[in-house]
Amino acid sequence: MSVILLLLNSIGFIVPVLLAVALLTLIERKVLGYMQLRKGPNIVGPYGLLQPIADGFKLIIKETLKPSNASPYLFYLSPVLFFFLSILLWSIIPVINSTLNFNLSLILILGLSSLSVYSLLGSGWSSNSNYSFLGGVRAVAQTISYEISLGLILLSVVVFSGGFNIGLISSVQNECWLAVCCFPLFSIWFISTLAETNRAPFDLTEGESSNSFQGTMLNIPGGPFALFFIAEYANIIFMNLFSVLLFLGGGSPVNLLFPINIISVIFKTVALVVLFLWIRASYPRFRYDQLMYLTWKKYLPLSLGLLIFFKFLLSLNKDYLQDY
């Protein structure tokens, strides 16, 4: 019976994630269209609402072709692993009932997000293409570089909240959000999440010019590409939801009023997602050396300095140290 309940719980959060990804693809094209003074998708269904279904059907019916010199197993295993890790991250978020809700959930999220680089590198290497391999190396270097800054920012959040549990971190922000109290920390976190999810202006791994078109997914056919695509957009929604829980107080100021607290979380997440799209429509792509310069010479020293500064300020409060 417990296995059946666990299976139903898993399906209960997988289906909404897939629906949210489909809706995000439509919202992205609509928002970018209106920002560029055009309508976006408006043919398939009323007002283009069925466009995600048409896109998914198109990818599914495409023939799955494998390059003749590609690795026979890793070529198909990498997209599945990337999709599985992306969906597994959602089981930790305690929105209603978390499948894996425990005290060290922050560490688990950081570890699972780090594992995705293996699927990206494996996908680039297994296709036996120089362009795909270079795109995979770029993706790995970018992800690892910005994860260091994200890890230091998470340590600062832990210092403020006194624990590694996501529910605890959200509950301590009832009076003041960390995004307000520590705005420099939140700004570094938000920009780093753009780089972590390979979004503009940090989407160098999927450059649309001749430098590395589609990057590691250059030779990926329709079905496996759909897994990469779904996982990438699921990561975008997840990182914004994670930002809401860490810095915007989750469902506060109505944490105890169900379902208003869920609506509050969804509203904040959608606002951050639209901000992602707004940045994509407004800013040009960084050069790769500028991307690395930003994280290693700007964000890493700044996030480390803020961590030491916040720890020093809180160490002056002896009552806090006793509770901690």
UniProtKB/Swiss-Prot annotation:
GO terms for cellular component: mitochondrial inner membrane. Signal peptide: none annotated. Its EC number is 7.1.1.2. InterPro entries: NADH_UbQ_OxRdtase_su1/FPO, NADH_UbQ_OxRdtase_su1_CS. Its main location: mitochondrion. It is found in: Mitochondrion inner membrane. GO terms for biological process: aerobic respiration. Keywords: Electron transport, Membrane, Mitochondrion, Mitochondrion inner membrane, NAD, Respiratory chain, Translocase, Transmembrane, Transmembrane helix, Transport, Ubiquinone. The chain crosses the membrane at residues 3-23, 76-96, 102-122, 148-168, 175-195, 227-247, 256-276, 294-314. It is a multi-pass membrane protein. It catalyses: a ubiquinone + NADH + 5 H(+)(in) = a ubiquinol + NAD(+) + 4 H(+)(out). GO terms for molecular function: NADH dehydrogenase (ubiquinone) activity. Belongs to the complex I subunit 1 family. Core subunit of the mitochondrial membrane respiratory chain NADH dehydrogenase (Complex I) that is believed to belong to the minimal assembly required for catalysis. Complex I functions in the transfer of electrons from NADH to the respiratory chain. The immediate electron acceptor for the enzyme is believed to be ubiquinone. This is NADH-ubiquinone oxidoreductase chain 1. It comes from Pisaster ochraceus (Ochre sea star). The gene is ND1.
